[in-house]
Amino acid sequence: MKSPLDDTIWGAAYGSVAAVQAAFDRFGPEYHHAILASGAPAGVARALMPHLNPDAQGIDFGCGSGVLGLALREAGLHQLLDGIDLSPVMLGLAAQTGCYRHLLRANLLAPGECSGFPALYDFAITMGLMGDYVPYYLALPHIVSALRPGAILGYAVERRSTPSHALEKLSAELGLSILSETVLPIPAGILEAQVYHFFVARLDA
């Protein structure tokens, strides 16, 4: 069955969702160490934790190798996260961190694949998912649907592919009030140099 991802940059660059998965399976361990070394996960945790109860229940969309789980635990989060990712290799690495309770292999944009998680989370987080790979306007509504009223969402976007006025408009339409914005540069390495803007927002009660 055709996936919405097939029409995004993922589909254009790799030909299919299966090819995207294969690419991330191939460089998973290298990616894990490169992203941790960039300092971006620690920056996300510093920006997010002031808005969270340490016992909050959260979900990590596009969790990859679990770098955000590690960073949030280091910053004082007590609870294990749930996580979703397309790559089995990445999910295996995330499991090894010991920071995740449940891990699900799923395509975020495929109807029904993420239905195993209840829409009751205190917070959700995503970094590296929205931007060049998955357009924010496709991903953000799915992510917001997993949150309870009043929950916190931390989401990073690649600014070069995400118009700020359009992102802010969609955030408001989804009931998100932006609380903070942090710039997170990623130096060139396994990935080309890029700049993430990390937003912390609260979903209307």
Regions found by a protein language model. Give the residues of each.
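Conserved beta-strand signature within the Rossmann-like core of class I S-adenosyl-L-methionine
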Residues: 150-158
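A short glycine-rich, Lys/Arg-flanked "PGG" loop and its adjoining helix->strand segment in the class I
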Residues: 137-149
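A short SAM/SAH-binding and catalytic strip from SAM-dependent methyltransferases
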Residues: 123-136
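Conserved class I S-adenosyl-L-methionine
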Residues: 1-50, 55-64
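A short acidic, Gly/Pro-enriched loop at the edge of an enzyme's catalytic core
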Residues: 114-124
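Core SAM-dependent methyltransferase catalytic element
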Residues: 189-205
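Class I SAM-dependent methyltransferase SAM/SAH-binding core
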Residues: 65-112
